[in-house]
Amino acid sequence: MTYSLLPHIHSPQDLHALSLDKLPVLCDEIRNKIIESLSLTGGHLASNLGGVELTVALHYVFSSPDDQFIFDVGHQSYVHKLLTGRNTEAFSNIRHDNGLSGFTTPQESNHDIFFSGHAGNALSLALGLAKGSSNSSSHILPILGDAAFSCGLTLEALNNIPADLSKFIIVLNDNQMSISENVGNIPQGISHWMYPQKISKLSQKIHSWIQNLPSFLHKKKTLSHKVDIALKSLSHPLFEQFGLHYVGPIDGHNVKKLVQALQMIKDQPQPILFHVCTVKGNGLAEAERDPIRYHGVKAHFQNTSLKKTSGNVELQTPISFPQHAGNILCRLGKKYPQLQVVTPAMSLGSCLEDFRKQFPDRFTDVGIAEGHAVTFSAGIARSGTPVCCSIYSTFLHRAMDNVFHDVCMQELPVIFAIDRAGLAFHDGRSHHGIYDLGFLCSMPNMVICQPRNALVLERLFFSSLLWKSPCAIRYPNIPANEKASNSFFPFSPILPGEAEILCQGDDLLLIALGHMCNTALTVKEHLLDYGISTTVVDPIFIKPLDRKLLQSLLTHHSKVIILEEHSIHGGLGSEFLLFLNQHNIKADVLSLGVPDMFIPHGNPETILNLIGLTSDHITQRILSHFKFSTPIPIERFFKA
């Protein structure tokens, strides 16, 4: 495609110079640029394609950064980045080394007001900005998807909007989707809030008629979209009851109408709910047909046929930890006919779709409501029913009090399947799963473990149902290096606090958590080149530790290395040092993990080099810390 307009847009001021008639052409160029770039890098595709016209219209009518846009989640901000001076090589490398973040990032641009990555906070942040702002001429525009209204935080903020708040426009991008289809009464109810029961029944009849049209009529989705807009325009929305002046619904893919509507409401003296209807994936036929698969794509998605996926993970070897976890839960579902699985909007990412299809009555997606997911799971456990709450590490932060008050304090046997435990690499600072141990370890009654491979993962899941205590099974989103057994229960259960010695040596004790055992075994080989032999231990459990085994090993090991892909504060290293202190054991301990900093996005090798967790870095840090006298590897010495 030839780009005639986009290369000349270096700021919103350049956009303002265009005539209204040129905006549809610019939108086409932006949409093509996103598809072109993400075909090389991967990233969040469907949500950005659906928001092109809306974002262009917002920047055309308002003047960022004086007028402030706050994107909820922020993964749909690619168009915003292109319009605010970031249509550079960095955009072409988005989410990779030397590329832009996939979320709004103030370090990139003063047009990004907040770091983003988690859902539901935009309205609260925007209200705070409005409260503290000394610039009475500035507009504040939180931009939310309809799924954000399943977040309690959004509803709390909605309950606190002053009726006399001016130049405050809530932009509701209603595409009836989250990552997957919306769940729960509120997002689905947005449409029902908009119009009364008679219109709702009419809508259902019309949509049913549209779906029964011949399959060769490819415009069915477009027709449904227009019907929604027409019917919603007949209604009186519930948002008026919150003191908001409702405007909409507006066709989110008609940039001229969007501009005209925004210009009309720009200086209204009360807070406004601006309701826009969009189609997720708009402009790319396959993304429109399947917005769930195209929510997030891998690089070269246009050049290879997309295989059947669970989330963004292609079902091909080697199988990842989340895929193994999903398969294991299906087998557990067959073995334990009461087992319930709960997730907060992560059914696809955490590979739970097979469980949902096999056991629909025993699967609950609560939407973007992590606190409810945890407390709901506690209620299930209290009834005597086994339950697994599957949740990303980074999103578990949002439910810390629920874990404390509703699970651990009640001593309820909820199994937490903590996905994405470790570095998130391309998704960056908001998504790294490297902080959860800091609060989980402080929770009484909590058992915490992490497998090094699929076989241990399998044993932990099967064993956890026998522990009868709250437990957390952590695992990263990386390939697991061994296949699970695929049988029901071929092993004796693991008891909490059972560690495993992987190899024995005389000079060092290296304790490595989870998948870092692979790195530890490589480091062990490197150290052999220096004549240093190492005992490598997989603790399996962070809490409780295998005290008996550790006390035995520490009788003849005084030099200890702790290796984990977690913050050095509050993780395995902290638990081990506490263990030494409690037992009055003296040892020289080198604790290696993620340093006390926010880790940026980037390729795995780059990030691991940055934080010193490659096998070469670790080897050199061990040699330096313990001041081993051999200056060069023995192997190289004899070769010389």
From Swiss-Prot:
Co-factor remark: Binds 1 Mg(2+) ion per subunit. Binds 1 thiamine pyrophosphate per subunit.
Keyword Magnesium belongs to the record: yes
Tree of life domain: Bacteria
Biological process, per Gene Ontology: 1-deoxy-D-xylulose 5-phosphate biosynthetic process; isopentenyl diphosphate biosynthetic process, methylerythritol 4-phosphate pathway; terpenoid biosynthetic process; thiamine biosynthetic process
Reaction it catalyzes: D-glyceraldehyde 3-phosphate + pyruvate + H(+) = 1-deoxy-D-xylulose 5-phosphate + CO2
Family: Belongs to the transketolase family. DXPS subfamily.
SUPFAM superfamilies per the UniProt record, alphabetical: Thiamin diphosphate-binding fold (THDP-binding), TK C-terminal domain-like
Cellular compartments per GO CC: cytosol
Name of protein: 1-deoxy-D-xylulose-5-phosphate synthase
Organism annotation: Chlamydia trachomatis serovar D (strain ATCC VR-885 / DSM 19411 / UW-3/Cx)
